[in-house]
């Protein structure tokens, strides 16, 4: 019950803020009339993938090509750059097929890895505390070290073959969208919808 009351209060407040903002925009912005043609807003929210994993090569997006060397380098538990990325299997051991990947983003669907777009790669842990450690105060440089899958966290696809890529070309791609909460999908679904954390009353 407390969750429902809090949600209604937040939604009313959000609607009021948006209403004022949209009202002001409708009178001031030159392209505001075009907004009246919008009947639906659909959000496609891809789970268990980073932006760069699917859209890092998307033309015009702030993706892999825009990353600095520091942003592209993963650190080990000792705080020093990893000498190479190890791709760990489901058993937690390095995959002998890929012994010496450089410490940098790499294509999953190209040599030397050559996994098919439809192939399954190990999913990194993304629970609340793991995620905080991986983000490392905003540096985002401990994903390989604080993971059961190692260097897979630095892999990405040429997503141009994905249907989602085509939709991004036709509609809108939010390359500066960031999840609201540490951890998995469910809590972030709640934040996407109501900007709140569910709780028991």
Model-derived features with residue positions:
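N-terminal secretory signal peptides that target proteins for export/translocation
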Residues: 1-9
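N-terminal pro-sequences and low-complexity stem/linker regions of secreted or lumenal proteins
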Residues: 9-201
